[in-house]
């Protein structure tokens, strides 16, 4: 039994030296799905958020999907939504999140920015998405 334990310990040490990684689980990287229309107003509304995503590098996994494509419609339905929704931001598969003050926020429709169409203006901002992701990136 000691031989087996010694062998497994030596194997783990060798793998760590060769790969540079431990056998412990790697830290979880948040997945952000941006389901959005590809029209100019949507692109402009999401530009600051996309720039922030890019600045995070490998701390985030970002997946972009045209919400009007068959794949986008299928993903929208998978999270229980349908209809004319120009933007959905999913963080680890969820569009509803808790703020630090305990209130719930939904990352649906346009962010609450000047010039956003009133009928599809959400109650979220780029800072809200950043706050949720910043907290999420701190988690192991």
Briefly describe each language-model feature range:
Residues 1-9:
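Bacterial N-terminal signal peptides that target proteins for export
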Residues 9-18:
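Bacterial N-terminal signal peptides
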Residues 19-24:
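Sec/Tat signal peptide C-region and signal peptidase I cleavage site
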Residues 25-56:
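Local sequence-structure signature of Cys/Sec-based thiol-disulfide redox active-site neighborhoods
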Residues 34-40, 63-64, 113-123:
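Second-shell loop/turn segments in exported
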Residues 43-53, 69, 73-76, 126, ...:
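Extracytoplasmic/secreted envelope proteins and their assembly/folding machinery
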Residues 58-72:
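Thiol-based oxidoreductase modules, predominantly thioredoxin-like and allied folds used
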Residues 91-139:
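Non-catalytic, surface beta->alpha helical segment in thiol-disulfide oxidoreductase systems
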